[in-house]
């Protein structure tokens, strides 16, 4: 039992040991995953010019792209309006170098051929007949406005391909609408006498020429393979009827043409009569407004009916009364319900129709029978005739774009697409419609339309996007639809930080605010004040605001269509930077919406709030800690020029990818070189020097040859030098990073880090045996070191100091001695930035720490065990005279025979009456020295045995055994059946009173006899 108790405390420590081992393995795994540093790229500025609406895009988790390096950078742009008025340019700049290129034309389906214009082609007719053998196609230029002159607009040539041959015709875009119509007549031999055939339409764009209409004559050869498709047109053998039938009553039906009428045109309306009509007299009253008149009424069957026309002119209406009499009975073989023509009414349209605008002319028809009221309203029917000077064939809406990116929820600024309605006439004439227009959006949760029907827009309240959302337009009896694609942002925003934990940079202090301080009187006080005004420098991080855009299905499904793809995000930093802020500006601040600056330790977040409401569009937590990191090295890339390459993407017509890289040609004499700097920190993060304020960067450059380099003009955060000449082996430039000049005191005069850049090709490395304890990494671009007390000339705030690396003047040597003394007097010594710890070293350190902790836990467990059981010794022998103190042992038992025997002894030998009471009650009546000897008088061991009756009738026996230092003079004789216990009662009478009372011995004589028996047995 003792062994189990001792082993029990080891259980929790074993569990903790297993947990720590698992934690060590996890540390090794995480360190292996953290092997690669943050991605690095050439911090060249890329911007699009003359592109009003564009976005930077990136793939999820791929910024910068994989092909970026210290000497190159790639960026992808999305142009939502790829054909602006001016040709868009992409400019790349890294002072003092800059270059630009024209964005290549858009690549269109299906042949992936670049075209310079975004053209929408709409086929007006779906079918043609020999009576109207004309196929009309409207071409419209989308995108931004174009120059007002017609010289820059191209021609569109329509090609028709039929099994019987080909035909083509061209039109030139007009500057007013940016549209034109091609009316192509099909040859008569293309039409079949019995079957319907099909002709395929396609178009090509060509520069304007000197032919009719400004376009070339073209050739009769087959259309080129690069032609873009328009659609197909069916060629019917005969002209289908175009009329409508309206019943005037149960027996008479009106059949009228369903086409617009032109001024001066004649047309005929026909009345049909059922064969079961039995009346012999029929009167037809026709009322027309001015501009339309009835000129004749002719019976279709003169042998059955006669017709008489009477005309009456009024101030507003002209009334014509036609009286029809039956001349003979109907044929016996005709069906009773069959309709047959019985009256033809001829109409004429007057020449004046109101300036060429289409108008409607109402015609009221009323049938009268004998015995019927002449003005019965129930028999009146109004039929409207559309009259126009133009032969209008279609109503077509023209939109600047067919795709809209809804950024209104992010900016609060509505997005609009202008829309213009035009009519297409026979002959190819176009005319804009501006009045009496109706419009309606089929889904207001996606897209809305203005009251004037001149634009579609999104205002920020829309909840979703969609592809092919429809907007309906109507004018008079003509209707048209416009389908667009709306991309909506999928909130919340993704706020991407290059580093979410900003730490204090060891040894780097920058000037702080000195407000409220008095001007110093001497130069020494100025230096002291400036040194006291320096504050800690924390890391900085770049910020990007990203969001995916998607279109929802119109049928209410959940499958989304993403812009560019599900793994592409749009950079909306230029849109939401004004609405972004740090929740606690004391901890960090956001400079320009793009750079996060740490201020003091704490935890906060970056929030972007909606400009339309108080809702949070996106949030990202960040922390600023007082943990210190070191600048391990500087990664330096010399830039002697930049090159740019542009390419079109395949995911979207407006996708453009720009790749820029630094030129590494050998520098010519007086060649200006810019140095791109990246700071590598001990927390495995990288940051370009452009993130930091140029006044906080103390940079210096040194060369082996004093006259090799000269300082260049300031170019912002970049470091520039002028190279006077270089040998064939290349020229190394050593760049060092210092704190600003006002904060260089003592240890802060030592460079924080340094790096080496090779101009041209670096020399071949000399094989040198490397020490095992100091591995050296080489790179073709940088050779980074952390310098100790190397003397490098430099100025504050990005100014460049140039000196020879091995040039040492006497005054400089004295200055070095003075600076060394100042550093010795400084309390804090500059700690060189440690080299980067490898993953193997991290794992070994973690395992070593785990083993040390396990050994410590084992030692603590042993000490606790010893302290807990050092006083618990096994019982010594009763004859051991060396035992310094007694040991009390308790024995629990239920020996019923022993308890009964003791009770019988007490009851059989009671004390005589009149004797004294229980000896435990007083000291009289007994020999005190015999009953309770003291420890000094009786060194023998003593014991007492007590028995008490339990509630259930079962007695327990409790033995108290005391081992004395010396054994008794005589061993006791134990009764048969009783436990062999050597016991002597050593307590006083007052101490054992409870024993007497519990055994039922009330009489003093009985108690005295019981005590004597106990002494005798002992």
From Swiss-Prot:
Region (Binds to HSPA5/GRP78): 606-911
TM region(s), chain numbering: 847-867
Spans within the Cytoplasmic topological domain: 868-1018
Region (Confers cellular localization similar to full-length form): 666-1018
Any Pfam family hit: TMEM132_C
Gene Ontology BP term (one): positive regulation of Wnt signaling pathway
Biased composition (Low complexity): 906-922, 932-944
Entry keyword Hydrolase: no
Annotated keywords: Endoplasmic reticulum, Glycoprotein, Golgi apparatus, Membrane, Signal, Transmembrane, Transmembrane helix
Entry's Gene Ontology molecular function annotations: protein homodimerization activity
Membrane topology note: Single-pass type I membrane protein
Main localization, broad class: Golgi
Glycosylated residues in this chain: 276
Family the UniProt entry places it in: Belongs to the TMEM132 family.
Protein name: Transmembrane protein 132A
Primary gene name: Tmem132a
């Amino acid at each position: 039992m003792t062994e189990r108790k001792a082993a029990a405390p080891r259980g929790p420590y074993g569990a903790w040991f297993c947990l720590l081992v698992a934690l060590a393995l996890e540390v090794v795994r995480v360190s292996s995953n953290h092997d690669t540093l943050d991605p690095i790229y050439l911090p060249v500025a890329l911007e699009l010019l003359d592109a009003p609406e564009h976005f930077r895009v990136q793939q999820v988790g791929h910024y910068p792209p994989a092909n970026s390096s210290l000497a190159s950078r790639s960026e992808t742009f999305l142009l939502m309006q790829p054909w602006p008025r001016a040709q868009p340019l992409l400019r790349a700049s890294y002072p003092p170098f800059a270059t630009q290129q024209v964005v290549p034309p858009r690549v269109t389906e299906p042949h992936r051929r670049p075209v310079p214009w975004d053209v929408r082609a709409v086929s007006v007719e779906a079918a043609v007949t020999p009576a109207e053998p004309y196929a009309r196609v409207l071409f419209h230029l989308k995108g931004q406005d174009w120059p007002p002159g017609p010289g820059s607009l191209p021609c569109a040539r329509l090609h028709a391909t039929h099994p019987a041959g080909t035909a083509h015709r061209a039109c030139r875009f007009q500057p007013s609408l940016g549209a034109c119509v091609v009316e192509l007549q099909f040859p008569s031999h293309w039409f079949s006498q019995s079957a319907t055939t099909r002709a395929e339409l396609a178009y090509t764009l060509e520069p304007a020429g000197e032919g009719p209409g400004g376009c070339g004559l073209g050739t009769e050869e087959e259309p080129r393979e690069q032609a873009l498709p328009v659609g197909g047109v069916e060629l019917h053998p005969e002209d289908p009827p175009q009329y409508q039938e309206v019943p005037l009553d149960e027996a008479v039906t009106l059949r009228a043409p369903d086409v617009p009428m032109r001024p001066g045109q004649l047309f005929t309306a026909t009345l049909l009569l059922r064969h079961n009509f039995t009346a012999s007299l029929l009167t037809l009253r026709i009322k027309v407004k001015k501009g339309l008149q009835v000129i004749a009424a002719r019976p279709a069957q003169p042998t059955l009916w006669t017709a008489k026309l009477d005309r009456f002119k009024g101030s507003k209406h002209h009334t014509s009364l036609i009286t029809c009499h039956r001349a003979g009975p109907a044929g016996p073989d005709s069906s009773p319900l069959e309709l047959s023509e019985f009256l033809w009414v001829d109409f004429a349209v007057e020449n004046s129709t109101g300036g060429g605008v289409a108008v409607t002319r109402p015609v009221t028809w009323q049938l009268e029978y004998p015995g019927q009221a002449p003005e019965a309203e129930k028999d009146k029917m109004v039929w409207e005739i559309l009259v126009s000077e133009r032969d209008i064939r279609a109503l077509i809406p023209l939109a600047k774009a067919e795709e809209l990116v809804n950024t209104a929820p992010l900016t609060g600024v509505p997005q609009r697409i202008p829309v213009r309605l035009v009519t297409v006439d026979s002959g190819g004439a176009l005319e804009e419609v501006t009045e009496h227009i109706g419009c309606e959006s089929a889904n207001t949760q996606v897209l809305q339309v203005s009251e004037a029907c001149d634009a579609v827009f999104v205002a920020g309240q829309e909840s979703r996007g969609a592809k092919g959302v429809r907007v309906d337009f109507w004018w008079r009896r003509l209707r048209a639809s416009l389908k667009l694609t709306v991309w909506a942002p999928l909130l919340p925003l993704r706020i991407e930080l290059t580093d979410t934990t900003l730490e204090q940079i060891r040894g780097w202090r920058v000037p702080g605010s000195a407000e409220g301080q008095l001007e110093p009187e001497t130069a020494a006080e100025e230096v002291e004040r400036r040194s006291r005004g320096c504050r800690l420098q924390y890391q900085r991080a770049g910020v990007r605001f990203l969001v995916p855009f998607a279109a929802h299905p119109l049928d209410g499904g959940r499958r989304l269509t993403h812009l560019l793809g599900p793994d592409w995000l749009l950079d909306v930093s230029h849109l939401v930077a004004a609405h972004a802020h740090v929740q606690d500006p004391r901890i960090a601040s956001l400079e320009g919406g793009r750079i996060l600056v740490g201020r003091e330790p704490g935890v906060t977040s970056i929030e972007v709030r909606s400009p339309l409401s108080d809702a949070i569009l996106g949030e990202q937590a960040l922390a600023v800690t007082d943990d210190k990191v070191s600048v391990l090295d500087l990664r330096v890339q010399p830039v002697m020029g930049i090159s740019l390459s542009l390419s079109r993407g395949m995911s979207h017509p407006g996708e453009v990818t720009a790749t820029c890289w630094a030129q590494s040609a050998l520098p010519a004499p007086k060649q200006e070189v810019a140095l791109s700097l990246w700071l590598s920190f001990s927390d495995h993060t990288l940051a370009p020097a452009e993130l930091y304020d140029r006044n906080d960067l103390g940079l210096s450059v040194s060369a082996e040859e004093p006259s090799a380099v000269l300082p260049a003009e300031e170019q912002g955060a970049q470091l520039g030098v002028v190279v006077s000449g270089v040998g064939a082996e290349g020229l190394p430039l050593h760049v060092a990073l210092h704190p600003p000049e006002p904060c260089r005191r003592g240890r802060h005069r030592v460079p924080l880090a340094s790096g080496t850049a090779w101009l041209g090709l670096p020399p071949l490395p000399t094989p040198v045996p490397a020490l095992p304890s100091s591995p050296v990494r080489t790179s073709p671009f940088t050779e980074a070191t952390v310098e100790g007390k190397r003397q490098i000339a430099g100025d504050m705030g990005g100014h460049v100091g140039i000196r020879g690396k091995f040039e040492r003047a006497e005054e400089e040597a004295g200055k070095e001695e003075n600076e060394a003394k100042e550093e010795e007097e400084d309390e804090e010594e500059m700690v060189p930035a440690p080299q980067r710890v490898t993953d193997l070293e991290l794992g070994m350190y973690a395992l070593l720490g785990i083993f040390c902790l396990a050994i410590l836990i084992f030692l603590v467990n042993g000490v606790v065990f010893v302290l807990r059981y050092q006083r618990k010794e096994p019982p010594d022998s009763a004859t051991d005279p060396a035992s310094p103190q007694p040991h009390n042992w308790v024995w629990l038992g239920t020996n019923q025979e022993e308890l009964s025997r003791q009770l019988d002894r007490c009851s059989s030998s009671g004390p005589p009456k009149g004797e004294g009471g229980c000896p435990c009650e007083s000291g009289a009546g007994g020999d005190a020295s015999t009953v309770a000897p003291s420890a000094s008088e009786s060194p023998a061991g003593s014991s007492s045995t007590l028995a008490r009756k339990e509630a259930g009738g079962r007695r327990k026996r409790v033995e108290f055994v005391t081992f004395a230092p010396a054994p008794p003079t005589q061993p006791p004789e134990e009764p048969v059946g009783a436990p062999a216990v050597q016991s002597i009662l050593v307590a006083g009478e007052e101490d054992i009173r409870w024993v007497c009372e519990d055994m039922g011995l009330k009489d003093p004589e009985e108690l005295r006899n019981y005590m004597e028996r106990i002494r005798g047995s002992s």
